[in-house]
C-alpha cells in the first residue's frame, strides 16, 4: 500500500466544473438522493442457473428434455453461475417477467464481493471539507481496494486489504464529526476504513445506505478471512443455509429426480415463509427460468434454492447478521448473547437462554443441534413477539395503583351507545361491548323516558332506534371487568321524569348489586380513593341532592351537553343554567363523582370538595388550557375533570386528547366509533399499564407543589431531556390503501414519524419515498427527536402512499414513549380502524440517550462542543421573600455540583464512544468490544491488564503501547474516574438538595400570609407563588436525576467489569486477574443473591 494513500491526495480547486478531479461538496453530493445502481454492475435481467445437458434427440428446454437432463446429471450441492449470463450487452426485445424492483438482492458474502469487484462510484471526504467523486473497485485477487481517477499512479491509488484495521459504518471519525459539510451527509450512507498503525481513515459516502452496507459487509468479510485461500468465496453452496434448502428439496422430491412441479415448489416455499404471496413466488420462478431461456412448469433444485434465497433474504437483516456474527453467515450462542446485551438491552442473559432461542427459531435440524442461527431463523426471531417494539412489562399492570383516582388518566368514551355519527346514527348495544373490551373505564349513558315506564337510551335525533336501559345495564354488568378489574365510571346523562328516575335507580341496584359503590365520602380525607381500593366497583357520576336535606326530590342544575349547545347555536341561551328535578333514590347512587359546575379556579380551590368533579366542553377546556394552563394543571392534581367533544362535531369526529392530557385532565371522552389519528393516539396511550384503562400521570402533575405549564415550549424544570434515535430501516408486505382508486397493486410508500406530547416535543419527520415497492421497501433513514417530558410523549409511525389516488393511508402504529424497547424491533402495523394487519410490519432501530441542557440534539463531536459551549445550569428563581430566598441560595452550590457530576460522567462516556468510532447510541458493551479488539495483539494476548482499585476496574498497560491506544486508555480512565466521583459523592450532594427542599416546603402553607406581610399582592404574589413552585420542582427533579445517575453509574461499572473479563482484558502475566475481578464485582454490588453470583 502506498504511504498515506487515503490522506495525501492533492485536491482539485472547488470551482472546477467537471474533469477527473472534480470535488463535489454539499447535500447533492452526499445525501443519498441518487438511485442505487444494479448490484454488482449486473444487467437488470441477469439471473444465474444450472446449465443442464440435453438428452439425445430431445430439446433441452422441453419438460421431457429437462427431466432426462436431470436424471443424467449427478446430484450437485453447488450453484454454478452461468458465465454466459454475465456478458454485458443488449438482449432481444421480449416479454419481461422481472419483478419490481428487478435488481438482484444481496443474500451472501459472494454477492457483496461480486458487487465490489464490479465497482461503483463513492464520494471521498477529506478533512478539509472537500468531497471527491471516485470510482472504487476490489481487485480480482481480493487483495486491494483501488480508486480512480487520481493524480497518483495506479499503484499508489490503492489500499491493501491487509492494512485495514477496522471498518466503521456511519459518520464516526473526526473527519465526519468536524467536517463543515457533515450535517449534509446522510448518516446511513457514510462509512470509514481505518488503516495503518496510526489508524488513518479513508472516509467515504455511498449513494445509498444499501451500497454502504454492501461495502462494509464485504470489507469486513475480507478482513476477517484475509489469511484464508483466495477461493474461499466460492463456497456459498456449502453454507448451512444451502445445505438445509437442499435437504428440504430432497425431502419433497419424492421421485428423487431433482425436479418438482412448480405448484409443489410454490407450496413448499409458502410453508417455509407464510408471508410470501403465491403470485410473487410464481413470478420469481418465471424470471429465473426466463434468464435461462426456458419456460416450464417444473423446478430444479438449484432454481428452488435461488428463488427461495432471493425471495426470503431481506438484505437489511443479512447485513445485520454479518455485522454481529463477526462476518459469518450464522450466529452462534455467543454472537446472539452479545446481540441481545449490546443491541437489544436484554439483561441477565445466559448461554442456555440463547441456545433455547436458537432451538425455537432455527429452521434446520442441523442448526438446532449444532447451536447456530442462520439468516432465515434469525429473520423469524426478529419478527417474533420477543422482538416486538412494545415493552412486555407494560403488557401487564406495571404502575402504582394505590394513588388517588385523580392522579390517573382514565380511558373514557363519549356517546358510547352510538356506532355511527351523532346526527342520525342509531343506538347500538355493541358500542358498549366494544368500548369495554378495549379497556374503557368511563362510559356514557344518555337516558330518556321510554314507553311503558321503561327508561331508554337513544340518539335524540333518531328516536326510532333505541335501547332499553335495563338491557344496557345487563351488558355493562357482563363486560364491565373483562378487560380490566379497576373501577368503571358510569357518566349518567339524566333526561328522565321522576317516576322513570326511580325505575333507573331500582334497575341499577338490581343488576349491579354489590358492585355499585355508594359509600359516602369521608370529610376527613383530602383525596379520592385509589383504583386499587375500588377494584371491581361501578361508580356513578351524576347530580346529587344536598346531603343535609331530607327531601325525597329536588331541583339541580342540568348538564345536558347537547341541549346547551343547541340553545347556544339557536340564540336561546341567556347565560342562565337550566334546572331539572332529581329523585332521592337516584341521587343516593352518586358518591365520589358528584357533578358540579365549574366557575373559576380560585373559587374551586377554596370551596370544591374532593369528591366533586366538573365536566368541560371541548371549547371551554381549550380556552382554559390556553389562558390558564398552570391553574388547570394544579386544579387537576386534586379534582377529576372530564372533557367531552364539541356538539358541533355532528360527524362524531374526535378532539385531540393530547391537548387536554397536557393539562392533567383525567377523563377525555372519545367517540370510539370514529377511527382516525386522534383515536389512534387514545388507543395507543392506553395500551400501557396492561391496558387496564388507568395510566399514572407524570409526577410533576401529581406533586402538591410543582411547576408545570401545559403550553411549555422549552425544557421542563427538574426533568432531564432525552434524545430518541429512530432508524426507519424497512417495511414488509405493505398493502395497497383500501380507498385507493389507482389500478394495480404498485405503491410508492414513505414513513412519517410523529412525536406527540407537550408543545416543546411535538414534531414530525418523514423518509424519502421508495418507488414501486410494497413487499420490502428499504428506507434506511435515521431521525433524532429531543423529548423534554418522556412520561407524556407518544410516538406514531404512519405509512403513506406517495402516488395515491383517493386514499394514501397504508398503516400506522402509536406507542407511548415509555413503552419503547431499544434495539432492532418490528412494529406491527394497524389498519385505519385499528386492527393489527397480519404480516405487515415496519423494521426499525430504537435508541434513547441522555441529553444535557436544552436545544436541538447536537451533531458535532464532543471536543468541538466542549470548546464552544459554556455549561448551562438550571437556575433557581428569586421569590422576593428574604427568608425563603436565603434557604434556596444554599442549594445553588449543591445543584451545580449535581449537574457537573452528571454531565462530566456523560461527557466522559461519549468521549470513549467517539474514540472507539461508535455513535452516542452505542452501549458500553460495544465500546469494550471495540476497545479490546485494539488492545489485544495478534497472538491473542492483551497489551493491558484489568486492575481493580477500590472496586473500580482500571486498565493498565503491560508495556509500551502506541499513541492511539494511549488516548483510548486515557479516555477510559477518565470515564472510570468520573463515574467513581459520582458514585462516591452523589449521596452527600443529594442530601443537601433534599434538606433545602424540605426547608423550603415548611413555608408552603404560610406563603400567602408571608407574601401579604411583605406587601406582595395580585400579580406579584402570584409570581412569588409560581417561583416558589419552580424552585421546589427544580430541587426535587435534580435530586431524583442525581440518584438515578448514581444507579446508572453503578450499573455501568458492573457492566464494564464483566465486559473486560469476557473480552479477555483480564489475562495479565501470571493469570489470577480474572478471579480477582470476579471477587471485586461482589464488592461493588449492594445486594445480590447467591444464585446471581453463581451466574456471574
Swiss-Prot record:
Residues 1-101, 550-569, 1067-1096 are annotated as: Disordered. The keyword Cytoplasm applies. Keywords: Coiled coil, Cytoplasm, Phosphoprotein, Transducer. The keyword Phosphoprotein applies. Residues 586-702 form the PI-PLC Y-box domain. GO terms for cellular component: cytoplasm. Pfam families: C2 (PF00168), EF-hand_like (PF09279), PH_12 (PF16457), PI-PLC-X (PF00388), PI-PLC-Y (PF00387). Residues 114-224 form the PH domain. Residues 83-222 are annotated as: Interaction with PPP1C. Residues 544-568 are annotated as: Interaction with GABA A beta subunit. Involved in an inositol phospholipid-based intracellular signaling cascade. Shows no PLC activity to phosphatidylinositol 4,5-bisphosphate and phosphatidylinositol. Component in the phospho-dependent endocytosis process of GABA A receptor. Acts as an inhibitor of PPP1C. Involved in the assembly and/or the trafficking of gamma-2 subunit-containing GABA A receptors. Interacts with PPP2CA, Ins(1,4,5)P3, Ins(1,4,5,6)P4 GABARAP, GABA receptor beta subunits, GABA receptor gamma-2 subunits and PPP1C. May form a ternary complex with GABA receptor beta subunit and GABARAP. The formation of a ternary complex with GABA receptor beta subunit and GABARAP could be the key step for facilitating the association of GABARAP with the GABA receptor gamma-2 subunit and to allow it to be transported at the right destination. This is Inactive phospholipase C-like protein 1. It comes from Mus musculus. The gene is Plcl1.
Amino acid at each position: 500500500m502506498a504511504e498515506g494513500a487515503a490522506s495525501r491526495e492533492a485536491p482539485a480547486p472547488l470551482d472546477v466544473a467537471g474533469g477527473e478531479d472534480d470535488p463535489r461538496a454539499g447535500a447533492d453530493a452526499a445525501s443519498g438522493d441518487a438511485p442505487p445502481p444494479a448490484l454488482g454492475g449486473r444487467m437488470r435481467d441477469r439471473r444465474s442457473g444450472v446449465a443442464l445437458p440435453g438428452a439425445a434427440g430431445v430439446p433441452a428446454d422441453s419438460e421431457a428434455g429437462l427431466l432426462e437432463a436431470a436424471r443424467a446429471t449427478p446430484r450437485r450441492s453447488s450453484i454454478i453461475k452461468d458465465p454466459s449470463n454475465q456478458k454485458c450487452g443488449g438482449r432481444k426485445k421480449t416479454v419481461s417477467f422481472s419483478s419490481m424492483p428487478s435488481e438482484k438482492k444481496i443474500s451472501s458474502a459472494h454477492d457483496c464481493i461480486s458487487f465490489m469487484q464490479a465497482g461503483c462510484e463513492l464520494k471521498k471526504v477529506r478533512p478539509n471539507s472537500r468531497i471527491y467523486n471516485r470510482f472504487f473497485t476490489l481487485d480480482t485477487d481480493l487483495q486491494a481496494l483501488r480508486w480512480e481517477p487520481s493524480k497518483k499512479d495506479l499503484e499508489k491509488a490503492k489500499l491493501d486489504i491487509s492494512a485495514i484495521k477496522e471498518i466503521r459504518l456511519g459518520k464516526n471519525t473526526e473527519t465526519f464529526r468536524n467536517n463543515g459539510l457533515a450535517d449534509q451527509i446522510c448518516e446511513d450512507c457514510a462509512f470509514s476504513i481505518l488503516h495503518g498503525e496510526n489508524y488513518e481513515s479513508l472516509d467515504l459516502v455511498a449513494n445509498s445506505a444499501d451500497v454502504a452496507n454492501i461495502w462494509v459487509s464485504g470489507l469486513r468479510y475480507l478482513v476477517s478471512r484475509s489469511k484464508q485461500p483466495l477461493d474461499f468465496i466460492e463456497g456459498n453452496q456449502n453454507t448451512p443455509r444451502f445445505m438445509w434448502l437442499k435437504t428440504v428439496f430432497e425431502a419433497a422430491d419424492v421421485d428423487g429426480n431433482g425436479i418438482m412441479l412448480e405448484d409443489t415448489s410454490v407450496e413448499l416455499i409458502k410453508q417455509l415463509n407464510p408471508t410470501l404471496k403465491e403470485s410473487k413466488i410464481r413470478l420469481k420462478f418465471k424470471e429465473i427460468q426466463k434468464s435461462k431461456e426456458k419456460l416450464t412448469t417444473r423446478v430444479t433444485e438449484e432454481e428452488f434454492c435461488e428463488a427461495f434465497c432471493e425471495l426470503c433474504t431481506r438484505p437489511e437483516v443479512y447485513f445485520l447478521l454479518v455485522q454481529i456474527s463477526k462476518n459469518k453467515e450464522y450466529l452462534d450462542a455467543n454472537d446472539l448473547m452479545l446481540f441481545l446485551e449490546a443491541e437489544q438491552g436484554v439483561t441477565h442473559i445466559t448461554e442456555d437462554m440463547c441456545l433455547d432461542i436458537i432451538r425455537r427459531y432455527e429452521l434446520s435440524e442441523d442448526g438446532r443441534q449444532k447451536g447456530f442461527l442462520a439468516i432465515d431463523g434469525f429473520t423469524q426471531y426478529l419478527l417474533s413477539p420477543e422482538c416486538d417494539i412494545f415493552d412486555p412489562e407494560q403488557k401487564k399492570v406495571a404502575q402504582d395503583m394505590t394513588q388517588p383516582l385523580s392522579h390517573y388518566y382514565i380511558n373514557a368514551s363519549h356517546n358510547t351507545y352510538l356506532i355511527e355519527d351523532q346526527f342520525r346514527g342509531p343506538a347500538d348495544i355493541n358500542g358498549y361491548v366494544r368500548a369495554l373490551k378495549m379497556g374503557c373505564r368511563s362510559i356514557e349513558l344518555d337516558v330518556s323516558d321510554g314507553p311503558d315506564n321503561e327508561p331508554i337510551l337513544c340518539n335524540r335525533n333518531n328516536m326510532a332506534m333505541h335501547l332499553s336501559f335495563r338491557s344496557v345495564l345487563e351488558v355493562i354488568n357482563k363486560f364491565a371487568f373483562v378487560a380490566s378489574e379497576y373501577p368503571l365510571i358510569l357518566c349518567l346523562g339524566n333526561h328522565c321524569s321522576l317516576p322513570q328516575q326511580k325505575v333507573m335507580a331500582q334497575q341499577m341496584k338490581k343488576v349491579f348489586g354489590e358492585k355499585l359503590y355508594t359509600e359516602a365520602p369521608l370529610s376527613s380525607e383530602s383525596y379520592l380513593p385509589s383504583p386499587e381500593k375500588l377494584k371491581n366497583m361501578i361508580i356513578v357520576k351524576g347530580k346529587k341532592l344536598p346531603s343535609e336535606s331530607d327531601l325525597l326530590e329536588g331541583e339541580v342544575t342540568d348538564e345536558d351537553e347537547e341541549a346547551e349547545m343547541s340553545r347556544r347555536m339557536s340564540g336561546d341561551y341567556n347565560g342562565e343554567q337550566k334546572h331539572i328535578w332529581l329523585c332521592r333514590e337516584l341521587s343516593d347512587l352518586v358518591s365520589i363523582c358528584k357533578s358540579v359546575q365549574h366557575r373559576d379556579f380560585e373559587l374551586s380551590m377554596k370551596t370544591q370538595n374532593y369528591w366533586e368533579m366538573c365536566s368541560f366542553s371541548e371549547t371551554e377546556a381549550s380556552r382554559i388550557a390556553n389562558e390558564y394552563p398552570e391553574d388547570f394543571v394544579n386544579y387537576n392534581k386534586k379534582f377529576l375533570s372530564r372533557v367531552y367533544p364539541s356538539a358541533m362535531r355532528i360527524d362524531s369526529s374526535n378532539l385531540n386528547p393530547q391537548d387536554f392530557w397536557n393539562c392533567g385532565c383525567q377523563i377525555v371522552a372519545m367517540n370510539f366509533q370514529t377511527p382516525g389519528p386522534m383515536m389512534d393516539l387514545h388507543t395507543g396511550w392506553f395500551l400501557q399499564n396492561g391496558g387496564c384503562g388507568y395510566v399514572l400521570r407524570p409526577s410533576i402533575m401529581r406533586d402538591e407543589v410543582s411547576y408545570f405549564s401545559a403550553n411549555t415550549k422549552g425544557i421542563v424544570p427538574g426533568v432531564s431531556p432525552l434524545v430518541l434515535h429512530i432508524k426507519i430501516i424497512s417495511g414488509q408486505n405493505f398493502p395497497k390503501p383500501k380507498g385507493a382508486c389507482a389500478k394495480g397493486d404498485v405503491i410508492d410508500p414513505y414513513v412519517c414519524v410523529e412525536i406527540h406530547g407537550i408543545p416543546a416535543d411535538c414534531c414530525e419527520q418523514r423518509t424519502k419515498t421508495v418507488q414501486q415497492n410494497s413487499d420490502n421497501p428499504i428506507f434506511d433513514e435515521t431521525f433524532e427527536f429531543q423529548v423534554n417530558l418522556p412520561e407524556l410523549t407518544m410516538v406514531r409511525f404512519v405509512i403513506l402512499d406517495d402516488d395515491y389516488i383517493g386514499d394514501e393511508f397504508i398503516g400506522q402504529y402509536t406507542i407511548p414513549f415509555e413503552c419503547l424497547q431499544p434495539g432492532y424491533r418490528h412494529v406491527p402495523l394497524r389498519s385505519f380502524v385499528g386492527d393489527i394487519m397480519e404480516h405487515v410490519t415496519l423494521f426499525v432501530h430504537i435508541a434513547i440517550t441522555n441529553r444535557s441542557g436544552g436545544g436541538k440534539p447536537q451533531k458535532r463531536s464532543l471536543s468541538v462542543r466542549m470548546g464552544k459551549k459554556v455549561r448551562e445550569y438550571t437556575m433557581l428563581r428569586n421569590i422576593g421573600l428574604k427568608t425563603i430566598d436565603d434557604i434556596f441560595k444554599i442549594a445553588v452550590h449543591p445543584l451545580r455540583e449535581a449537574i457537573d457530576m452528571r454531565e462530566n460522567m456523560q461527557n466522559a462516556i461519549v468521549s470513549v464512544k467517539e474514540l472507539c468510532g461508535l455513535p452516542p447510541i452505542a452501549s458500553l458493551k460495544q465500546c469494550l468490544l471495540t476497545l479490546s479488539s485494539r488492545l489485544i495483539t495478534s497472538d491473542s494476548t492483551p497489551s493491558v491488564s484489568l486492575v481493580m482499585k477500590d472496586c473500580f476496574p482500571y486498565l493498565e498497560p503491560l508495556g509500551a503501547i502506541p499513541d492511539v491506544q494511549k488516548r483510548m486508555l486515557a479516555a477510559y480512565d477518565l470515564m472510570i474516574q468520573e463515574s467513581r466521583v459520582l458514585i462516591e459523592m452523589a449521596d452527600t450532594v443529594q442530601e443537601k438538595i433534599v434538606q433545602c427542599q424540605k426547608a423550603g416546603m415548611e413555608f408552603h402553607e404560610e406563603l400567602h400570609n408571608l407574601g401579604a406581610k411583605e406587601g406582595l399582592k395580585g400579580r406579584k404574589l402570584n409570581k412569588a407563588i409560581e417561583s416558589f413552585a419552580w424552585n421546589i420542582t427544580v430541587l426535587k427533579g435534580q435530586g431524583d436525576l442525581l440518584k438515578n445517575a448514581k444507579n446508572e453509574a453503578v450499573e455501568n461499572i458492573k457492566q464494564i467489569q464483566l465486559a473486560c473479563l469476557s473480552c479477555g482484558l483480564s489475562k495479565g502475566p501470571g493469570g489470577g486477574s480474572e478471579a480477582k475481578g470476579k471477587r471485586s464485582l461482589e464488592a461493588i454490588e449492594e445486594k445480590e443473591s447467591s444464585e446471581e453470583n453463581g451466574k456471574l
